[in-house]
Design a protein with these regions (language model features):
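Short glycine-/acidic-enriched loop or helix-start segments at secondary-structure transitions
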Residues: 6, 48, 124
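A beta-strand edge to alpha-helix "cap/lid" segment located at domain peripheries
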Residues: 3, 57-132
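Alpha-helical structural motif
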Residues: 12, 24, 51-52, 111
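Short N-terminal micro-motifs specific to bacterial/archaeal maturation
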Residues: 19, 42-46, 115
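Short, low-complexity N-terminal intrinsically disordered segments enriched in polar/charged residues
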Residues: 1-34, 129-132
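A solvent-exposed, acidic/Ser-Thr-rich amphipathic alpha-helical stretch
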Residues: 25-29, 33-76
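Hydrophobic alpha-helical core bundles mediating ligand binding, dimerization, or RNAP-core interactions
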Residues: 13, 20, 32, 52-59, ...
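Alpha-helix C-capping/helix-to-loop hinge sites
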Residues: 16-19, 38-39, 88-89
Length: 132
């Protein structure tokens, strides 16, 4: 049975974004395979699991609330593509509303093996502002 047919992809997608929205870094780490590679717009290289988890942890700690407005999610055998608007309120009093396209591959063990995330890195700048 393929990953798509087993319903694993729907579960992984829902759990990942729900975990980030709910500040649950433990679940995020559990969903990532040990060999996962993650690339974000603006990155010069892929990140391994530890660095990828640190980036998500930073985002969770830099924000007080996060919400994903899913525009579209399409599944393919072994993964999915999602377009969404990420709404987040920063601890520094700022807010972001970023349009994102993310491609996620899921291995046969039901763990994420690859993430490619496309967005305008400049839209994260308000969260980095410590002058507020």
């Amino acid at each position: 049975m393929s990953v798509t047919e087993s319903g694993v992809l729907v579960d992984v997608a829902d759990r990942l974004f729900e975990a980030i929205a709910n500040s649950d870094i433990v679940t995020v780490k559990e969903l990532l395979s040990e060999e996962v590679l993650v690339w974000h717009s603006g990155d010069s290289r892929d990140s391994a699991k530890e660095r990828a988890a640190r980036i998500i942890d930073w985002f969770i700690n830099a924000t007080t609330s996060r919400r994903y407005e899913v525009i579209e999610r399409q599944f393919f055998d072994g993964g999915f593509v999602q377009q969404h608007i990420l709404h987040a309120d920063g601890r520094n009093g700022t807010s972001i509303h970023m349009r994102v396209c993310i491609v996620i591959k899921v291995g046969t063990a039901g763990l994420i093996t690859r993430i490619d995330e496309y967005f305008d890195p400049a839209e994260m700048a308000p969260l980095l502002d410590t002058s507020n």
